[in-house]
Amino acid sequence: MEKTRKFKFAMSRDGIIAYDRETPMTIRFTPEESNEMTKKIYDYTSMDYYCEVAHLEISNTCNMNCSYCYTGDKKGHELTTIEWRMIIDNLAKGGIFQVSFGGGEPTLRKDMFLLAQHVAHTGMNLGMTTNGMTLPAMTPDEKRSLKTYFKQINVSWHEDAKIVERALKVLKDFEIPAGINYAFSRTMQKDNEVVKELAKEYNAEVLYLVYKPIDLDFKEQVPADVVRDYAQKAANDRIKVAVDGPCVGQCLMKKKFIDVDSLGFVYPCSFVRKPLGNLLHSSFEAIWKSRGEQDECPFVKFEKEKVV
């Protein structure tokens, strides 16, 4: 018997959003489609945008030292398990659909699975971005826990195919949906075929990301339309692909996404480090309501929104 889907619904400036936690899948209805579905006329332009995703920097330590990391120096200052549980509850109460663990390196936290269990208890969906180094050394029970709690785990590409391959093998062996986060910089553009081959072999999705020059190394940035073309070619090669907002002319800052750092401060974007408030001191609803208008991105020049 086919399982009945249970959608969460939200009304936003763009229309009605339907989210299926199990898939996970998001269906977006235009204002016209939303009015037809509800048999009522709503003025969606008077509504606010709905925040769907929160990225949680649960760790401020890392076993790599990437110069392009958006969180900057890793000083090891982190919240306690209880404090992160409070933040997770705060986000769930605010209606967030999905959270993603990141860092730093999230797997370095000894309480990662306790936090993952708490996310599941709140009913939110959970993903993770990791550099993959620790996955092969996890115990069988820990690997099974990865499958239990995480809907998808993405391994970041840092020019070391062996690290990524070992991590992807763990995810494939335990039937955990996998992805490769591929920051498409000038330096890493050469790795495209290697990334695609790994994705094919391990049935992983490639997330093509426009490089954000946080160190003002704009020469490393490949234009968004070029990144999008590479993603399209990968899709034509029957590789599962996804792209970030800049690839399609969308900036999610203050519209659908927030980043929460290792001390509970909320940022409008992982790369724009201007705190909007702290989830240990304010409700998510209050922070979102007072966030103000979308700022101009200091790292990416957005083209007109595209459909791909």
Q: Residue spans of the language-model regions?
A:
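N-terminal pre-core extensions flanking Radical SAM catalytic domains
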Residues: 1-75, 256-257, 268-270, 283-306
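Short loop/turn motifs at secondary-structure junctions and domain boundaries
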Residues: 48, 247-252
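A short acidic, helix-capping loop that chelates divalent metal ions and anchors anionic groups
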Residues: 74, 214-219
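Flexible, glycine- and charge-enriched loops at secondary-structure boundaries
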Residues: 76-84, 220
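Radical SAM/AdoMet-radical enzyme domain recognition
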Residues: 81-102, 109-209
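C-terminal accessory region of radical SAM enzymes
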Residues: 220-248, 270-308
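Short, acidic, Ser/Thr-enriched surface-loop or helix-capping motifs
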Residues: 260-261
